[in-house]
């Protein structure tokens, strides 16, 4: 059975919550978006488990001041309590001041998702940089 519209909307919200949490460095909120033992492959390293995910998100504002994750072309498929999503990413950040916003990276995400305790969460999120 295909996903219900409410499930698709909940997954869209999960993805938006991810972007907002990582951009402001809210490590606890970011890590809570993943199942226990969930992982993020950033394209450069793999971050796994609540503590590593929390610490990673907490560092983003200092590594990429003014970071803004902008995603598009979201495609969600699934059945029951399992789903996948694919989407494109642009990450913008400031360099030397707010007036100098630049495109830092482009790529795509490939996600595996699971309904966990009634909420959709990431099992794995893989970022595949362009080029």
Model-derived regions: residue spans:
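Short, low-complexity N-terminal intrinsically disordered segments enriched in polar/charged residues
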Residues: 1-28, 32-36
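Short beta-strand edge/turn micro-motifs at domain boundaries
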Residues: 84, 106-131
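Beta-strand elements of well-folded, non-transmembrane domains
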Residues: 91-95, 113
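Short, conserved clusters of charged catalytic residues that mark active-site
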Residues: 13, 71, 108
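A solvent-exposed, acidic/Ser-Thr-rich amphipathic alpha-helical stretch
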Residues: 27-91
């Amino acid at each position: 059975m295909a996903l219900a519209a409410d499930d698709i909307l909940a997954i869209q919200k999960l993805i938006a919550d991810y972007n907002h949490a990582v951009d402001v460095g809210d490590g606890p909120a970011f890590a809570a978006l993943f199942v226990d033992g969930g992982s993020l492959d950033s394209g450069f390293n793999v971050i796994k488990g609540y503590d590593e995910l929390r610490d990673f998100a907490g560092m983003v504002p200092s590594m990429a001041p003014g970071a803004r994750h902008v995603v598009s072309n979201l495609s969600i498929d699934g059945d029951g309590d399992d789903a996948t999503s694919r989407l494109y990413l642009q990450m913008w950040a400031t360099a030397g001041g707010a007036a100098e916003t630049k495109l830092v990276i482009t790529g795509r995400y490939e996600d595996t998702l699971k309904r966990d305790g009634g909420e959709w969460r990431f099992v794995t999120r893989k970022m595949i940089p362009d080029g």
